[in-house]
Regions:
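Catalytic glycan-binding domains that act on GlcNAc-containing polysaccharides
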Residues: 33-227
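Bacterial N-terminal signal peptides
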Residues: 1-7
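N-terminal module-boundary/linker segments of secreted carbohydrate-active enzymes
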Residues: 14-32
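Sec/Tat signal peptide C-region and signal peptidase I cleavage site
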Residues: 7-14
Length: 227
């Protein structure tokens, strides 16, 4: 994959990464994760130079709310959003009744995060998080997210090879970080898996649950114009 292309790491760096990764494995085992699952998830894992490159060159700028709307909520996205709202109306209404979040808000967040599931990122989440944790700039944060990602695999929600997301580790159609997955993901179709990658009932219910647990008030509008 082109996303994995980059300059090879020096031999000593690769060796140091392997030693560091063993430390992660030891920590995960100490937290009760299955050793066989960990061995499979961590086998052959290497840092991804492209992830470091993207982390280093994040743009530093701010947008006004109007600029944000023009960039993110364009006419095309609004049109598709209306189509998706109609297409999944019955499912969305059932979820809305349970979580007290109107269907249009679930679809709107879905569209903003991943263009209705179209752009979810093409990076292997565990390798990306390991790269960022090893890099050192935000090591504590990303190491924690890596351990949680491994726990998600250990719980059987998804296999490590299918756990894809953004370069920063945001996963699935609603772009949850692993810790957010643990806090908000829902197995709405009751199949034993919280599948925010490919199961729309789980995707929508997880979005609604996230909003509800974050203090969403269904009796209030999302915002008001201010002078």
């Amino acid at each position: 994959m082109s996303l994995l292309l980059g300059l090879p790491l020096p031999a000593h760096a690769a060796k140091d990464f392997g030693t560091w990764l063993q430390g992660v494995r030891t920590e995960a085992v100490g937290l009760g994760l299955d050793e066989e699952t960990l061995d499979k998830a961590l086998a052959g894992l290497k840092p991804i130079p492209r992830v470091i490159e993207l982390d280093r060159r994040q743009p530093e700028f701010t947008l006004t709310f109007k600029q944000y709307l023009q960039r993110v909520v364009n006419a095309r996205r609004v049109k598709i959003g209306k189509q998706k709202l109609a297409e999944h109306r019955q499912l969305l209404e059932r979820i809305a009744k349970k979580y007290k979040v109107q269907p249009r808000f679930m679809v709107a967040l879905w569209g903003i995060e991943t263009d209705f599931g179209r752009i979810t990122g093409g990076f292997p989440v565990i390798a990306s998080l390991a790269t960022l944790a090893y890099d050192g700039r935000r090591s504590k944060f990303f190491r924690k997210e890596l351990i949680v990602a491994l726990r998600i695999v250990d719980q059987g929600h998804i296999t490590s090879d299918k756990m894809m997301g953004s370069w920063a580790g945001a996963m699935g159609q609603n772009q949850f970080m692993p810790s957010s997955f643990q806090a908000y993901a829902v197995d709405y179709d009751d199949d034993g898996h919280k599948d925010i990658w490919g199961t729309l009932p789980d995707v929508f219910a997880s979005i609604a649950n996230y909003l509800t647990k974050s203090g969403w008030r269904d009796d209030q509008t999302w915002g008001r114009p201010a002078m």
